[in-house]
Amino acid sequence: MHRSRPDDLIVGPAILFAPANRPDIFPKATAIADMVILDLEDGAGDAERDVARNNIAQASLDPSRVIVRVCGPDDPGFKEDVEMVRSTPYSLVMVPKVYTDIPKELEGLHVIAMIETPQAVVGIQGIAEHPDVVGLFWGAEDLTVLLGGTHSRFMPDEGAPDNRPGPYRDTMRLTRALMHIHAAAAGKFTIDAVHADFHDQQGMFEEAVDAARSGFAGSACIHPKQVETVRRAYRPEPAQVEWALRVVDESQHYPGAFKLDGEMVDAPLIAQAHRVLARAHGAG
């Protein structure tokens, strides 16, 4: 059975993390990015967790543009995090350190499950198919640690550039691909992982271009300077838009496949053309 993905929950591709212990930057983050992730996991220490929860509860932000990242299910503060979210207008909840089960405390919320444990990778199908899960997001660094590794990316002594992060290792790329495929099969959206070196704008751009053209709904950002880079990556090039317009126009005159500039165009390419135009329209 075909099910449409709930992509309308992601209003734009540039999704910026904001630490929950810094309420002064909440409005700035929402003004810059398409969506903001108010972060209780890495954005607040244990000593200030109550204050951070209150910061989120008191924030007057557009609920359609807010994701709250709670602590993982094994954290002592998980239940209090979820209870706080239920007291707010916010319903999109990002849950880190998922293993195989979605905790019952999340019932009725829109859950973005993080795939960053070996157990979650093995159990992606069940996680993606859970009725409360609307999307998946992955994290390379925690997964690398839990796999017993030391680096999620190739290093200069392995042939990577000296002046920028290398590409992800095969285990990371496999996780990303499996997550994306299982999410699509279950009718859910995906968000691509952060590019940790926010000075590496070219690397961020290249990874975001791949995410956009592969079908991810958005890419996570950890610094405001990454936002426009992501938007630019998700915005189709003029030549792509021109091609898509021609394909869609020509498809009106043919019941099936047709030839355009020496290339055979059939239903999958027509669908891709429509998506290019949708991306271009969404990019404004």
Label for each model-derived stretch:
Residues 1-284:
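Expand to "…catalyze enediolate/carbanion chemistry for C-C bond making/breaking, isomerization
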